[in-house]
């Protein structure tokens, strides 16, 4: 059985697996795919969950909440490629279920790409799943941004970039720092 609400609940083989729960419930195996706020429980003092050490540490830094990392022999953590520490979870039983929160199939400086896995059921987030969402080539956009930054700073200007605080800002920062001619400085 798969149930939406309070994250995603998958019940199989007499166990309850809860992916990205909003509320922590007893007697369930909780999994947190990554540390973006829309994938975290809204309130808890402490909890046990299957997640990466990076995700645990980010939650501690962002929310000052403690998570004890646990494991389960039926659950395999796989790279999701979304942000540092992001994971997909493959639950094996009579049926195999693969859950992904956000994922990325492109290698990035701070993450490994998500790789396809065989499964019976795939549960995925589809924030931009509609055909109307077509994005330009990532490397091309990053190149344009680096050129723009170098041009601004080369004219003794000051550029301020806005990006999501967890994920995009690190990606932009790493990309800009790795360009051939440094363009970042304190403004």
Residue ranges and their predicted role:
Residues 183-187:
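Long, charge-dense
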Residues 170-175:
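A short acidic (Asp/Glu
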Residues 19, 176-177:
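Surface-exposed amphipathic alpha-helices with a cationic face
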Residues 180:
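Active-site ligand-binding patch in enzyme domains
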Residues 2-25, 29-163, 167:
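His/Asp/Glu-rich metal-coordinating catalytic cores
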């Amino acid at each position: 059985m798969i149930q939406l609400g309070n994250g995603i609940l998958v019940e199989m083989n007499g166990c309850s697996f809860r992916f990205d729960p909003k509320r922590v419930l007893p007697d369930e195996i909780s999994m947190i795919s990554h540390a973006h706020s829309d994938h975290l429980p809204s309130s808890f003092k402490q909890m046990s969950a299957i997640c990466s050490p990076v995700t645990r540490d980010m939650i501690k830094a962002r929310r000052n909440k403690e998570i004890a990392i646990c494991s389960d022999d039926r659950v395999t953590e796989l790279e999701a490629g979304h942000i540092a520490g992001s994971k997909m979870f493959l639950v094996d039983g009579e049926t195999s279920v693969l859950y992904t929160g956000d994922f990325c199939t492109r290698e990035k400086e701070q993450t490994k790409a998500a790789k396809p896995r065989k499964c019976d059921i795939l549960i995925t987030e589809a924030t931009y799943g509609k055909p109307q969402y077509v994005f330009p080539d990532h490397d091309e956009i990053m190149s344009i941004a680096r050129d723009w930054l170098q041009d601004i700073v080369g004219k003794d200007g000051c550029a301020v970039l806005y990006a999501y605080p967890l994920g995009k800002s690190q990606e932009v920062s790493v990309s800009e720092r790795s360009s051939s001619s440094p363009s970042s400085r304190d403004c």
